[in-house]
Regions:
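Bacterial N-terminal signal peptides that target proteins for export
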Residues: 4-5, 10-25
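C-terminal motif of bacterial Sec signal peptides marking the signal peptidase cleavage site
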Residues: 35-37
Length: 465
């Protein structure tokens, strides 16, 4: 068993760190990971910008009648989605930003299905309530209906089909079950309609690609897509107020000493061939190279399992997972807003053009390639570090606790377990891993993490109350 390197922020240091987003950021940025997003055509009735439903009024008698309900069905369907996006069922071919939307919609459907029966928390969409519906039937059907539409075209529904059959078979026949199934259908349809306006923005080849830069530091096209997901920054957030609410401060100048330091770091540690990475640094790079939502769902499930059983009913569990995945989705949208706004180049461009960047202290390498191929998008800030910090903050705030014994695996590295004493430790290692993959300079990862924490805090304070 390996333990992550020391030097990660404590709770106090974490708080100081994420408030840095209000100050001038000092280092540079770049890239992010893989996507070949060919999205299935989704046809719904557009329902633009409908406000999340906030109706949580219910009688004390109604709440007490279902004061505790097992989270087993919620956890089973959350685990099923995690499995669906686990290598080899999902390798590097599924894009993180698009997948973040899938996880958020799926878990919001589960959350809303429950709260349309007994409204303990605010709902994301407005669906007519049915207090007599079976909760487990509603959860199973809502989750199934969402993933059946938003999954990637090459993903099989065989396991989801089997889980739906098993889930419904375990519920006694009768009116409550029928009502639960009908409610699940209705909630899923409302979620899908609410987010149907996203569809143009999740295409890899969105038509309005910005012009290629020609000055040092400006984004250079990366063939064949040139600039991928160039409309993603226009997608409406799930919880945060606007795409630019957590926009980062500008990156540093290309001719600055900080840029030189970060340039040389990612050039030597992030390259595919001839790297100076240690064996553990390479392990860290590969360990965190999977889909962000899958990894953080694994972490969330370990956190949930560590709680006293009676402290986590279906409603509370569903809310936690919905908030965390909504935070990850919003962090992706927020990061893409900053990427598009600053239009900063990625390491693969900055290093290959290092001899013509106006910095006498950088040496270019026209053959440089990152350890892991990355999506052709702006290099600042780091999207993974922003998403990881947002997810971590939701988990920390939800239980007001950072210290956990986390033992995480990786489908890319069978038999490898990495241990973390705190959620913050996991966030910190996730952040630095993107230097080792060759996706980001340190400023980009630091900037992403710095805004990810307050973004997660905002989601926790304002979402699904």
């Amino acid at each position: 068993m390996k333990k992550s390197p020391g030097g990660n922020p404590t709770m106090q240091n974490r708080s100081k760190f994420y408030h840095r987003f209000k100050l001038p950021l000092s280092l540079l940025a770049l890239f992010f990971l893989f996507v070949t997003a060919c999205m299935k055509d989704e046809v719904f009735n557009d329902q633009e910008n409908a406000l999340p439903d906030q109706n949580v009024v219910s009688s004390d008698q109604e709440l007490s009648s279902r004061s505790w309900h097992s989270p087993a069905m919620v956890n089973a369907w959350s685990q099923a989605l995690e499995d669906m996006f686990t290598f080899p069922t999902n390798a590097l071919s599924k894009g993180q930003p698009v997948t973040a939307r899938i996880f958020a919609m799926y878990h919001l459907a589960i959350h809303d299905a429950l709260n349309c029966i007994t409204p303990k928390y605010a709902r994301y969409v407005g669906v007519e309530r049915d207090k007599d519906a079976d909760p487990d039937a509603a959860v199973a059907q809502a989750a199934y209906d969402v993933i059946a539409v938003v999954k990637y075209p090459d993903q099989s529904m065989a396991n989801m089909n089997a889980l739906l059959a098993t889930s419904l078979a375990g519920i006694p026949e009768g009116d409550a079950k029928d009502r639960g199934i009908a409610l699940g259908h209705a909630v899923a349809a409302a979620i899908l309609a609410q987010r149907a306006v996203d569809i143009p923005y999740i295409q890899l080849n969105y038509p309005n690609v910005p012009a290629e830069g020609d000055e040092p530091g400006e984004f250079r096209y990366i063939p064949p897509a040139n600039y991928g997901l160039s409309g993603y920054h226009l997608m409406a957030p799930f919880i945060i107020a606007s795409q630019d609410q957590f926009r980062t401060d500008p990156p540093y100048a290309v001719n600055s000493p900080e840029y030189t330091t970060d340039y040389n770091e990612v050039k030597t540690l992030g390259r595919a061939i001839g790297s100076l990475r240690t064996a553990e640094q390479t392990e860290i790079a590969v360990f965190w190279a999977e889909i962000t939502n899958r990894k953080w769902n694994e972490i969330a499930q370990q956190v949930i399992a560590s709680r006293p059983p009676q402290s986590m009913d279906a409603w509370k569990t569903a809310r936690l997972l919905a908030l965390m995945h909504a935070a990850i989705a919003d962090a992706n949208i927020s990061s893409f807003d900053s990427k598009f706004y600053y239009y900063f180049w990625a390491p693969i461009s900055s290093i290959r053009l290092g001899d013509t960047d106006g910095n006498d202290n950088t040496v270019g390498d026209p053959l440089w390639t990152a350890l892991i191929p990355a999506l052709p998008i702006g290099g600042y800030p780091g999207v993974h570090s922003e998403a990881g910090a947002a997810a971590g903050e939701v988990l920390i705030r939800f239980f007001d606790k950072d210290n956990y014994d986390l033992d995480l695996d990786c489908p890319f590295l069978p038999g490898v377990i990495r241990h973390f004493d705190t959620i913050s430790d996991a966030v910190d290692e996730f952040t630095i891993s993107k230097i080792y993959t060759g996706h980001n300079m340190r400023l980009a990862t630091d900037a992403g993490e710095a805004v990810g924490y307050p973004l997660g805090d905002y989601v926790f304070e304002n979402g699904l109350q």
